[in-house]
Swiss-Prot record:
Protein name per UniProt: UPF0473 protein str1961
NCBIfam families on file: PRK13678.1-2 (NF010215), PRK13678.1-4 (NF010217)
HAMAP family tied to this protein: UPF0473
InterPro entries per the UniProt record, alphabetical: UPF0473
One Pfam match: DUF1292
Source organism phylogeny: Bacteria, Bacillati, Bacillota, Bacilli, Lactobacillales
PANTHER family in the record: UPF0473 PROTEIN CBO2561/CLC_2432, UPF0473 PROTEIN CBO2561_CLC_2432
Length: 101
């Protein structure tokens, strides 16, 4: 299984708006090209400025996304919890990313 990923974002920041209209800034940790296997890309996000907790962990959110035709912005969608194949691929790429850093 081969998936391209990019982690040279120099801490690109995006904002997400929740159901209550609250805007939260996130840093892009990693993008994954899953188009060949799943027909979409993925992005892993961490809250902007977040630090590890007492256990050395940090909250990471994963979304699938589709870029606009001009390569800018796009739609983020939650990844279905029951999509084991997608989650397995994301976990594999993330673990490789951690091992490289």
């Amino acid at each position: 299984m081969s998936h391209n990923h990019d982690h040279n974002h120099d801490h690109e920041v995006i904002s997400l708006v929740d159901e209550q209209g609250n805007e939260t800034l996130f840093e892009i940790l990693l993008t994954i090209d899953g188009r060949e296997e799943f027909g979409k890309n993925y992005v892993l996000l961490v809250p902007a400025g977040a630090e590890e907790d007492a256990d050395g962990e940090i909250e990471i959110q994963a979304y699938s996304f589709t870029e606009n035709e001009d390569g800018t912005e796009g739609d983020l969608q939650p990844i279905p919890e029951d999509s084991d194949a997608e989650w397995d691929m994301i976990e594999e790429v993330f673990n490789s990313f951690i091992d490289e850093n």
